[in-house]
Every structure is written in C-alpha cells, then in structure tokens.
Amino acid sequence: MGALEYVPALGPKPRRSTRINVDALVKLASEVLTHHRHLGGRFAGTSGGKALADILKVGTSAGGARAKAVIAWNRRTDEVKSGQLPAGPGFTYWLLKFDGVAGNKDKELEDPQGYGAIEYAYALMAKAAGITMTECRLLEEHGRRHFMTRRFDRLDAGSKLHVQSLGALGHFDYNQAGAYAYEQAFLTIRQLGLPMTATVEQFRRMLFNAVARNQDDHVKNIAFLMNKPGEWSLAPAFDVTYSYNPSGNWTATHQMTINGKRDAFLKADIRAAGKSAGLKQGRSEALLEEVDAAVERWPEFAARARLPADVTEKIRKAHHLDLSG
C-alpha cells in the first residue's frame, strides 16, 4: 500500500496486469485461512499452484488479517485485474474484501457471510454523517457480496501516493489497546501543519466510532497522505464498520481513549476532547448532533444494503445514542 515498493531480488518481474477470477480467489482464501498450517500439501497441483500465485499477486500487500485483494476494476466491462500494476484505460484501483471466506476474522469472532454488506451500509451512514470516504460499492457474485472501496493511495492513472498510519508516524503499537488517545491524533494533525478542517474531520470520525460502535478503532486505522511536493493531508476514512463484541477481549471497548476513557463516554468527555482539539465552544456538541442524526437513520442504510432484519436490529440496539452528562 502507499508509494513504497519492494522488488524481489530473484524471479521474473511482471510486466502487465492480468485478469483474475474472484470466485476462485474466495475459495482459495478459505483454504488458506482454514488450513494455513498444511499449505504445502494442499496446493501442490498445477491448478492449485496457479490459484495460489494469483492470490499472492493481489493480496499480499493489502495488509490486515482479513482476506482482501488489491484489484483494478473496469466499471464498463466489470472485468477485474490485479491492481499491482497499471491495468490500462478504463480501470480504476480498489481494495476488495472477500465475503464468504471460512476463517476470515481479525482478532475475535469469525466474520459471517454478508459482513461486507454491513461495511457498505456503514459507509453510507458515515458519509451521511459528513465523513470523507472514497467511493464504496458491493461486488456480487455466486451469492456473495464483496465490499469494495476505491483506493485513496492511487490516482486515476495508477500513480501512487505515500501513506503512513498514525501508528507509524507516532511509533505507536496498535496491539496495546487503550494505550493511545484520540487527543494524540489531534496533536499529530497539528504537528503535520494540517488545517483545522482536518481536526474537525477527525473529531467527527471519533464521534461516529463512539456512537456507531466501531470499536476496532486502533492507531493503524487513521492515516495520512503525502503528495509529490511533500504536502501532508488526512486520508479518507477507512475500515468504518460495526465492530463490537461485548464478551470479547478486543472490541468490548474502544482501542483509543477519549478523555482517558475507553467506554461509557459522556458528553463531558466529548467536550473535554473538543477543548483538546482546539474546537470552539459548542462545536463538539453540534458535531455530535450531526453524527447522532445520521446514526438514527441506520435502518435506512441497512435496507439499502439489503441486510437481514435481525442483523439490522441487533446493530441498532448496540448503537450508543444515549450519551449524557
């Protein structure tokens, strides 16, 4: 991801982007995640080796624990190619998160089929809350619905932008849950010389995570872009989805703190964070009202994503719309 490249010392260098079969990649990703300890014996055949080579082409630099791929997609023809190399006219560059993959999870519960549709509904809701995101959509095939988000580190012609996470810039370890604060994100924004609009944008994302139960909000899920002249900017929001497991060790509470707290936030905590961010008096409450208004429309966005009624209701009940104090 980003503009950094690593070239193998040995082996042939690919010269062009090749077409890929999403269905085959999903099946192989399931095999990889389910039988990762026995890969040597399971993919020795010619077709298996070809499929494994394909998934390595598109997936190894996407990052994260869940199965995903970097692809080039042609909107007119619906053709999908590897996104590692320039794909030619008509193609744009996307990150595809596989749906229906056995063993697909991050730190806790395995993702159910349809998880991508939840992320799509959340993307719609986040945009309604005024959060900046790239274009998102669902790629449907064989009863699966893969979440796609357009890459913000690639320009239309495929040229690259440098990207660094908050964790990378601050040398923060995202595995240390609760060790870092949203206030540190606001400080980093100031240190990079970004305008107040970037601080307001990040504050809005913090509120959305708190209200909509995106509790996998660690320091690698905030990123910054640098263009060729060396100018920094806050990257669009990403990994914005329902992530709450009240009985888990990871997402039972938030990964980053607000006013020193990881859960049970009060309006007083929001005001304190707003003061730390340099917001004018009353601005934090106004932003919270805007986010609340969008999250209250959750059933509308869930319907647009065609989520089952029981899933919609479970998530609605978990939303934290009752901040007091």
Language-model-derived ranges and their functions:
Residues 1-325:
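Phosphate/dinucleotide-binding and metal-coordinating scaffold of catalytic cores
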